[in-house]
């Protein structure tokens, strides 16, 4: 008869619902903040790489145009 109550108590202690709510709340806040920081860093890196690529592509297109015809690089002469 004593086994069943002891088993239930042990089961309740081992269940995830018995965890400390403050600890899980702090952990979830820290995880959310870290994910937001990671998203902001990724956006900045993506935007800077796109802008850098556009400048590089513009230079390549200008060089190709100048090698084909001199009309597009008349401003440089």
Curated annotation (Swiss-Prot):
Main location: secreted
UniProt GO cellular component terms: extracellular region
Protein name as it appears in the record: Conotoxin Ar5.1 b
Signal peptide positions on this chain: 1-19
Membrane-traversing stretches: none
A family per Pfam: Conotoxin
Proregion residues excised on maturation: 20-44
Record PTM text: Contains 2 disulfide bonds that can be either 'C1-C3, C2-C4' or 'C1-C4, C2-C3', since these disulfide connectivities have been observed for conotoxins with cysteine framework V (for examples, see AC P0DQQ7 and AC P81755).
Tissue specificity of this protein: Expressed by the venom duct.
Keywords carried by this UniProt record: Disulfide bond, Neurotoxin, Secreted, Signal, Toxin
Single GO MF descriptor: ion channel inhibitor activity
Family stated for the protein in its record: Belongs to the conotoxin T superfamily.
